[in-house]
């Protein structure tokens, strides 16, 4: 029930943000180490200080999500050891420290358990298993202690846990929140952080270097704050549910993002909504989803393909890009690339959009500019140019089903 309430809150927020575009349609596990350390504790009530947030984002983030410190007065203190897993089976706050090899922090608690892990200068290096593995809980908080630096590394190929493909340094089957006042460094031969439900980030400094998706979730990714640096061969933020294309949303209300990605900087299946934050994205495609809404933020995109791309990936949303505010600077590479590419509608009601490239905009449906400033190759234009007339970008690539590509026009007229 708690997870359903959280999902409803996110859906309500996204529905409000997407008003300009109407919808198109209304375990068992194996412990890999030779020995195990088990920690149990009765639930302790954390002191919570409410953070300033907008009325909309408050429906997504709870007070505890946004609180960057934990009440450790009744916390269980644990020290890591080589070759030993630390298994948490009950709700509560756990302060973990130490350096270890081939050791995992495992959460396997009751369905209603809320577990808070406080990392205090932790260093874990594993060859084939997650450093933090959430098997079962209601929600898990991973909090970096103030002034701490924590490093989690997986150096080899991940080994499955039974039927579960554990392919990330932090791997969670349930809801997970990352926050705190310290630093978290993640290095992975696959994904960085993977959540099979919802992932929330509300604070801390997070550095991810990986070969696959840096942060991926089945249902949603929500970010309120934090300093996030990503270097990946695939996507920076990726939300997709292989079994349900009505899931896979991304909501960002703040934070600083420096993303270098081989594929997409930010990719959602259903929606991407940006209400704030500072973004520097260098990637093939900058921001991609079925339905994209930008209300505020400072966004700089350098893309070898499209800067912002809306293409049909979900039956739950209409294909649309809406820009209501913010400062956007988009630079594209040479070739069949577009600054803003919508396989549906495009609306600009506010903000400043500065596009440098061969084609500024490409849209298949309706385009309306009722406000804001649009600059194309140094010249301000009151109309939205269109370089349609050909193949259109899809999720993860360009061109139609026959491989035909669009023409190369699209300067303001």
Please report, for each region that a protein language model flagged, where it lies by residue.
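A composition-driven surface/loop motif
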Residues: 2-413
